Amino acid sequence: MEKREITGVQGQVNNIEVIFKEYYGSLCYFASRFLKDEEVIEDLVQDVFIALLEKKMLFQSEVHLKNFLYLSIRNSCLNYIRNT
């Protein structure tokens, strides 16, 4: 099984741009089920991608990555609702 590495260090595999383009729209749509403010939604989705880049995570498969992204944005939305 091929692992997908997410890093921001030059000279290493850097798939974050591809992943961002692939999932940004669907994550924003998913977040809109919880929140109505588009600016907040975009900020939360971007924060998830920043966390992904900063943590330099390694995923077993595309499914694991997708699950991480959707769970992260769900939790971010719920935290936002709880704190406002």
Language-model region placement:
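Bacterial Sec-dependent N-terminal signal peptides
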Residues: E2, I19, S76-C77
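A short, charge-rich alpha-helical start-of-domain segment used by transcription regulators
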Residues: I6-Y29, R33, L53
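Residues at secondary-structure transition points
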Residues: N14, V18, E22, E39, ...
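Conserved RNAP core-binding helix
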Residues: F20, E38-K55
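Arg/Lys-rich amphipathic alpha helix in sigma70-family domain 2
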Residues: R74-T84
